[in-house]
UniProtKB/Swiss-Prot annotation:
Organism: Halalkalibacterium halodurans (strain ATCC BAA-125 / DSM 18197 / FERM 7344 / JCM 9153 / C-125)
Localization per Swiss-Prot or TrEMBL: Cytoplasm
Gene name tied to this protein: abfA
This protein's record includes keyword Cytoplasm: yes
Protein name: Intracellular exo-alpha-(1->5)-L-arabinofuranosidase
Domain of life: Bacteria
C-alpha cells in the first residue's frame, strides 16, 4: 500500500531569509576534535601548520560557514592566554570539564588560521565560568582591535598584524548546568553576561553576542532561566542559545524519529519567551535564536566511562552514527529551516571525531559518517528563502508523541539561481509515500535531480566501509505545475527543481 501526502508551495508564502550560519558547526578542545582531528603534525596529508588537508577538504565539501570555538564545557575553565604566543612556552593544563590534559598547541590564532582555510567564520566563546568580564574584554581587544593597545600589540608580536575581526561571540556555555565550572543562577549569570557584553561591545561595537539559554529544555530552570537572563541582557545581546541532543536508547525507531517534534516545540517556546521579554521592555529589538549545539548523541556514553583520566586527546564522544541517525539529523535540519525567520545561527555539534560527521584515523584516512550527507545537502542546497509549505500527511502515534506526520519537509527558494529545493523525510517503516505537490507559481521548472539516502539496515554505519551513501535515482517528475514524487520508506530526499 502506498500512502499519499500533499503539499502546496507558493513563492509568495515565505517564512524568511535563511541565514547561512544555520549550517554552522562546532570544534571544542575535547577528545580528538582538535588533536588528531583537525590537527595532526606529521600526517601524510598534513599542511605546513600541521592541519590535515583531508579534513579541510571534507569541511569545505560541507560548506560550513561558521564554527563555534573553543567550547563547550571546556571554555568555562579555559585561560585563552595559554593558547597564544610561542608554542614552546605554552603551559599544559588540566581540563577539568573532560578530565584530560590540554597541551595548548592549538589556540586562538591557529584556529583562526584553520577557519580561513576551510572558509568559515569563527564563533568565539568567552569564559564566564572560572573567569569573567576582564578576560572577555581583553580577548575581544586581542582579536579585533587593529593596534596601539597592549592586547592588540601582543597579537601583532605573535605574528598577526591584521585583526581577526571575529563578529560572533558566545557569553559562556551552559551556565545553569551542575557539571559546569562556575555554575550560576539565572540572576548571577544574567548580571555577569550583561556586564561582559557591555564591555565587549565597548571594545568593538560591531560584534554580535549570544547569551546562554538553558543547557536543554528538560532543565528544571528552563523558561525561567531564559526570561531572567534576557531581562538582564536584552540591551546587549543579539541571540539566545539552545542546546539539544537526542538518542535511541530504547531502540524504538518510531519514537526516535518523532523527536524532531520536541526540537520544534523547544524552538517555539524560546521564541515565545524572547518575545515576552521584548513586550515587557517595550523594546523595538527582536532577539533571535542560536541553536549552537544540536545532534544525536548516545552511542559513546559507555565507552567514555572507560577512559583513563588526564590523558591527551583520548577518544571521547566518538559516536559511530547509523542510518537511522541520519534520518533524524535530516528531520532536525528541516526543523531549523521551518524556523528560518528566528533561528539565525545553528551549530551541528560537533565537526570532527567528537559526535561528528567527519571521523579520522591517526596517520590514516578521514571518512564520512552517515550524518555527513543530510548536513551537506542542506548546507549546499538550502540557501535562499524558506517557504511556508502547506503539508497534509498521514500521521502516527509513538510512545512519547501523538500526530507525528510521516512526511517531514521543508522548501527553499533560491530566486537568483531560479532553483527550488525540497528536503523530505519519509518516517514510515514499511510504506513509500506518494508526494503530490502543487508548484503552480514555479512555471517552467523541471526536476534537476532527486537525491535519496536509504538503506535496508537501520543500524548500518560507514565505519570500515561506506555502506550508507546517497544515490541520484529518485523517482520524481513535474507536469503542468504539479510535482509527483515517490519517497521510499525511511528515506531522506533532496528534490531539486530549476529552469536551467
Amino acid at each position: 500500500m502506498t500512502l499519499t501526502a500533499t503539499m502546496v508551495v507558493d513563492k509568495s508564502f515565505k517564512i524568511g531569509e535563511i541565514d547561512k550560519r544555520i549550517y554552522g558547526s562546532f570544534i571544542e578542545h575535547l577528545g580528538r576534535a582538535v588533536y588528531e582531528g583537525i590537527y595532526e603534525p606529521g600526517h601524510p596529508d598534513g599542511d605546513e601548520q600541521g592541519f590535515r588537508k583531508d579534513v579541510i577538504r571534507l569541511v569545505q565539501e560541507l560548506q560550513v560557514p561558521l564554527v563555534r570555538y573553543p567550547g563547550g564545557n571546556f571554555v568555562s575553565g579555559y585561560n585563552w592566554e595559554d593558547g597564544v604566543g610561542p608554542v614552546s612556552e605554552r603551559p599544559k593544563r588540566l581540563d577539568l570539564a573532560w578530565r584530560t590534559t590540554e597541551t595548548n598547541e592549538i589556540g586562538t590564532n591557529e584556529f583562526v588560521d584553520w577557519a580561513k582555510k576551510v572558509g568559515a567564520e569563527v564563533n568565539m566563546a568567552v569564559n564566564l565560568g572560572s573567569r569573567g568580564v576582564d578576560a572577555a574584554r581583553n580577548l575581544v581587544e586581542y582579536c579585533n582591535h587593529p593596534s596601539g593597545s597592549y592586547w592588540s600589540d601582543l597579537r601583532i608580536s605573535h605574528g598577526y598584524k591584521d585583526p581577526h575581526n571575529i563578529k560572533t561571540w558566545c557569553l559562556g556555555n551552559e551556565m545553569d548546568g551542575p557539571w559546569q565550572i562556575g555554575q550560576k543562577t539565572a540572576e548571577e549569570y544574567g548580571r555577569v553576561a550583561a556586564e561582559a557584553g557591555k564591555v565587549m561591545k565597548l571594545v568593538d561595537p560591531s560584534i554580535e553576542l549570544v547569551a546562554c539559554g538553558s543547557s536543554n529544555s528538560k532543565m528544571a530552570t528552563f523558561a525561567d532561566w531564559e526570561a531572567t537572563v534576557l531581562d538582564h541582557t536584552y540591551d546587549y545581546v543579539d541571540y539566545i542559545s539552545l542546546h539539544t541532543y537526542y538518542g535511541n536508547r530504547d531502540d524504538d525507531l518510531a519514537n526516535y524519529l518523532a523527536q524532531s517534534m520536541d526540537m520544534d516545540e523547544f524552538i517555539r517556546s524560546v521564541i515565545a519567551i524572547a518575545d515576552y521579554v521584548k513586550a515587557k521592555k517595550r523594546s523595538k529589538k527582536t532577539i533571535h535564536l542560536s541553536f549552537d549545539e544540536w545532534n544525536v548523541w548516545f552511542h559513546s556514553n559507555e565507552a567514555d566511562r572507560q577512559i583513563t583520566p588526564w590523558s591527551v586527546a583520548p577518544p571521547l564522544l566518538e559516536d559511530i552514527y547509523t542510518f537511522e541517525d541520519a534520518l533524524l539529523v535530516g528531520s532536525m535540519l528541516i526543523t531549523l529551516l521551518k524556523h528560518a525567520d528566528r533561528v539565525k545561527i545553528a551549530c551541528l555539534a560537533q565537526l570532527v571525531n567528537v559526535i561528528a560527521p567527519i571521523m579520522t584515523e591517526k596517520g590514516g584516512p578521514a571518512w564520512k559518517q552517515t550524518i555527513f550527507y543530510p548536513y551537506m545537502h542542506a548546507s549546499v542546497y538550502g540557501r535562499g528563502v524558506a517557504l511556508q509549505a502547506q503539508i497534509s500527511s498521514p500521521k502516527y502515534d509513538s510512545k512519547d508523541f501523538t500526530d507525528v506526520p510521516y512526511l517531514d519537509a521543508a522548501v527553499v527558494h533560491l530566486e537568483e539561481a531560479e532553483e527550488v529545493t525540497i528536503f523530505a523525510v519519509n518516517k514510515h517503516q514499511t510504506e513509500s509515500l506518494n508526494l503530490q505537490c502543487d508548484m503552480r507559481s514555479f512555471e517552467g521548472y523541471h526536476v534537476l535531480e532527486h537525491i535519496v539516502l536509504e538503506h535496508e539496515n537501520m543500524k548500518a554505519t560507514n565505519q570500515g566501509r561506506e555502506q550508507v551513501t546517497p544515490h541520484h535515482n529518485g523517482d520524481s517528475a513535474i507536469d503542468q505545475g504539479r510535482l509527483t514524487a515517490n519517497l521510499a520508506k525511511l528515506s531522506w530526499n533532496v528534490i531539486r527543481l530549476g529552469k536551467k
